[in-house]
A protein has these predicted regions:
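Intrinsically disordered, low-complexity Pro/Gly/Ser/Thr-rich segments with frequent PxxP/GP/PP motifs
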Residues: 49-84, 90, 98
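Beta-strand/loop-rich accessory regions of lumenal/periplasmic or secreted enzymes
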Residues: 75-82, 96, 110-421
Length: 421
């Protein structure tokens, strides 16, 4: 079965290199013995994930090892505030012994214009009802409600949009959103000597103690309600302090800014993020970010920025030994929807994030040793991360490079949750 690394190898080994320099396309022939007369050069322009223009550029017969430049066309579909991506493809002109005409041998994507992410500034325009007792806090508005337990762990216990509950609450998922610092070790994490996976287990990263440190709320001048919750994930010699600031608006929008602060003695950190457990009905996953295959900070060259869609079941990669998979980098927004295309939407605020949607918790994957025995649950585990550790190559080579590791400093995940109708 083809796994995401195959696409990465194909991309990195491509026989033609493409760059944009000074408004022109620079083409380098990486072949040793043939020129580029066997290929065509095609392009597509996508705006916010939708193809708007396409065309072909005449490709010079560039000799092996040489480079040349081509003028780019004038694009008509660039729109202010929109994300505009140009994809250039090199494809076979004619059938070959090993592939048909049109087979893509190389491609590159160029961002012509970055789209605006959600702004941090949002004004409330309606009334909210706040009901509180010793154990819980309930905030409601027109067509929605959100509730927290405030004494044990500060968990969100309910999120209802248009009369439908978004969250599920299996016994083995007691806190929502749960701070996720651990991942099911990959083959590379186990590596020569198993050092990363061993370190994580030695420090208790796989089974943290979660403490509620504080919980309080207040009203803003415009009527929006701010809920501040601080929790700690405690490990053998260190901890990660999570501070979550929810701002609830009358239309059901929930702005969530979460900071993660590692403290004390900790091993290499696998991730810093949160996870929700969603009801089984919301099993169609759509995202604008890198895809369609899973990708990580140091393995995303082959994953294009685009608008992708698939079932949640399709997101997990079935390696023989269960391990972390399904991550998507540079997510601008995502939705999880039911058969009526209704559900929940999450937007990045100011900075993109990493995300996955799976039918497995981290523990489901971690505690199983054979893929054939891994049983999907009905619920959807939506993970969103401020930082994700790279994969490295230490199953047979070096570990994660420093630039793809997670610095032990404060990291922030800022998202905006709303109803998808």
């Amino acid at each position: 079965e083809t796994t995401p690394k195959y696409w990465e190898v194909k991309k990195v080994y491509a026989p033609v290199e493409l760059r944009v320099e000074n408004g022109e396309l620079r083409v380098t022939n990486r072949n040793h013995h043939i020129d580029l007369s066997l290929y065509r050069c095609l392009w597509t322009l996508s705006v916010d994930g939708k193809e708007k223009e396409r065309g072909e550029i005449t490709l010079p017969e560039i000799a092996p090892g040489e480079s040349g430049t081509i003028g780019l066309p004038a694009f008509r579909s660039l729109k202010p505030l929109s994300d505009c991506q140009l994809k250039v493809s090199i494809v076979l002109k004619s059938d070959a012994l090993w592939a048909k005409a049109g087979h893509e041998v190389a491609w590159e994507q160029f961002c012509l214009q970055k789209g605006d992410l959600a702004s941090a500034d949002l004004i409330n325009k309606g009334a909210l009802q706040v009901n509180e007792d010793d154990k819980s806090l309930l905030i409601s508005g027109r067509g929605f409600s959100v509730q927290w337990e405030k004494k044990v762990n500060g968990s969100m216990t309910s999120l209802i949009y248009k009369g439908k509950e978004m969250l599920a609450h299996p016994d083995d998922f007691p806190v929502q959103p749960v701070t996720q610092v651990f991942r099911a070790p990959t083959d590379n994490d186990k590596s020569f000597g198993n050092w990363l996976a061993k370190d994580w287990k030695l420090h208790g990263m796989d089974h943290p103690q979660i403490n509620l440190e504080s919980f309080h709320h207040e009203k803003r001048a415009d009527g929006a309600v701010i809920v501040r919750i601080q929790t700690s994930n405690l490990y053998k010699e260190g901890k990660v302090v999570t501070t979550s600031v929810y701002t609830v608006f009358s239309d059901g929008t929930i702005d969530l800014e979460t900071t993660f602060l590692p403290q004390g003695v900790l091993p290499e950190i696998p991730r810093l993020g949160i996870a929700f457990c969603l009801a089984p009905a919301y099993d169609t996953f759509t995202w604008y970010g890198r895809g369609a295959q899973d990708n990580y900070p140091d393995r995303k060259t082959s994953a294009m920025i685009g608008l992708w869609k698939g079932s949640v079941a399709e997101q997990y990669v079935h390696y023989p030994r269960p391990q972390d998979s399904g991550n998507k980098e540079e997510v601008h927004y995502l939705t999880l929807t039911d058969k009526q295309n209704k559900g929940i939407r999450v937007d990045a605020v100011e900075n993109v994030f990493s995300a996955s949607a799976l039918h497995y918790t981290v523990q489901d994957i971690y505690e199983e040793t054979h893929d054939c025995n891994l049983k999907p649950r009905a619920e959807i585990i939506l993970s969103m991360d401020a930082a994700v550790l790279g994969l490295g190559n230490s199953s047979c080579g070096p570990g994660v490079l420093k630039k793809y590791a997670i610095e032990k400093k404060e990291h922030t995940l800022h998202i905006r949750i709303s109803s998808k109708q």
